[in-house]
From Swiss-Prot:
Pathway(s) annotated for this protein in UniProt: Porphyrin-containing compound metabolism; protoheme biosynthesis; protoheme from protoporphyrin-IX: step 1/1
Described purpose of this protein according to its UniProt entry: Catalyzes the ferrous insertion into protoporphyrin IX.
Gene3D superfamilies xrefs: 3.40.50.1400
Membrane-crossing residue ranges in chain numbering: none
GO BP annotations listed: heme biosynthetic process
Domain of life: Bacteria
Protein name: Ferrochelatase
């Protein structure tokens, strides 16, 4: 019987306060996160941004216990999935590849080679595909695989996205229903989906399918929820976690919360739709920051749906994904990372800083200049900002 390696790809997160700076550096060193015209500046810019953001980010992690639980939860998911697959008769072993913190993809590849894996199934722990999440992880894996003659021989199948998988939808409905049942008027509870945002240009200029998949997913969940409960609930979708000067997907979560408060919404069921495990954006951004905004807006009951973590129905769905991937049409690593064709005035492969026709580029260029000036001053210890007493 073939030895199957199931590779679960995720973001990663700092486990201790001292990890925050290096984690941010790894994050912003990724050109899928920040696109600049000259690659030589990528790492200096990443160092600058991570240095400037470290203190604030450390405070956020301190508020949830001093570190991210994402590794612990992902390891639990991997163990549960491995057990489920073996119960179904597969000789499967799960591995974890984090993009920006330990255990990195290189470590997972080394472990699979040492274990003599015969074929690999790759599942990103992002239900919806995006350039900056699954896409970045797929491309990192491809780069490492292409440079490893031994690992390159191992057959590999990939799951690109899985937001419409039946058990995933069912598990989301089960968790949402739990919170709705706690409301005084369940049919009036407002379902508030909040997804991690991406820059608008990713969708409009590069063809990222993320926005469409998020919208489709939220409607699928609402339809299944209505079947389960026997009534429909009002619902809204928003996007959170934007950073930088460019425009991100709208509407923004904090703005929608204020609008819902003005509309006299009392019971709000917050659904973190793009996260399958608890981490900084659920535990701190939603549970602390957005809850405070909601309460200030007059929303009386703010209820956040738990992340899927190791929900049994969710783990069952992941196991079915693995089996379907093994039995279905081959999707290789190259295909998994591809973007759909889009008609535009410039080549899609040249979609990067300075090549699209959006005014956001100019905002980005200005920000780039500011970052570089600040970087030079931090290194040199002199300049106009020092003379003004800003630095």
């Amino acid at each position: 019987m073939d030895k199957i390696g199931v590779l679960l790809m995720n973001l990663g997160g700092p486990e201790r306060i001292n990890d925050v700076g290096p984690f941010l550096y790894n994050l912003f060193s990724d050109p899928e996160i920040i696109r600049i015209p000259f690659p030589v500046f990528q790492k200096p810019l990443a160092w600058l941004i991570s240095t400037l953001r470290s203190t604030t980010s450390q405070q956020a992690y301190l508020s949830i216990g001093g570190g991210s639980p994402i590794r612990r939860i992902t390891e639990q998911q991997a163990r549960e999935l491995q057990s489920k697959l073996r119960d179904k008769g597969l000789n499967a072993t799960t591995y974890i590849a984090m993009r920006y913190w330990h255990p990195f993809t290189e470590s997972a590849i080394a472990d699979m080679k040492a274990d003599g894996i015969d074929q690999v199934v790759v599942i990103p722990l992002y239900p919806h595909f995006s350039i900056s999440t699954s896409g970045s992880s797929f491309r990192e894996l491809k780069k490492l695989r292409d440079s490893d003659d031994e690992f390159k021989k191992v057959p590999m199948r990939c799951v690109r996205s899985w937001y419409s998988q039946s058990d995933y939808l069912k598990s989301m409905v089960e968790l949402i229903s739990e919170q709705i049942s706690l409301c005084e008027s369940p049919s009036k509870a407002h379902i508030f989906f909040t997804a991690h945002g991406v820059p608008k240009s990713y969708v409009e200029e590069a063809g990222d399918p993320y926005k469409q998949q998020i919208e489709d997913c939220s409607l699928l969940i609402i339809n299944e929820l209505e079947k389960c409960l026997g009534h429909s609930n009002p619902h809204t979708l928003s996007y959170q976690s934007r950073v930088g000067p460019v425009e991100w997907l709208k509407p923004y979560t904090e703005e929608v919360l204020a609008d819902l408060g003005r509309s006299n919404v009392n019971d709000l069921i917050v659904v973190p739709i793009s996260f399958v495990g608890e981490h900084i954006e659920t535990l701190q951004e939603i549970d602390i920051e957005y809850k405070e905004i909601a309460e200030q807006a007059g929303i009386k009951n703010f209820r956040r749906v738990k992340a899927l973590n190791t929900h049994p129905t969710f783990i069952e769905g992941l196991s079915d994904l693995v089996i379907s991937c093994l039995e279905g049409p081959l999707v290789n690593l190259e295909e998994a990372s591809q973007l759909p064709e889009k008609v535009k005035l410039y080549p899609q492969e040249k979609w990067q800083w300075g090549w699209n026709n959006s005014s956001e580029v100019w905002n980005g260029r200005v920000a780039m200049i500011i970052f570089l000036v600040l970087f030079i001053e931090l290194i040199s210890g002199s300049g106009p900002l020092h003379k003004l007493g800003i630095l």
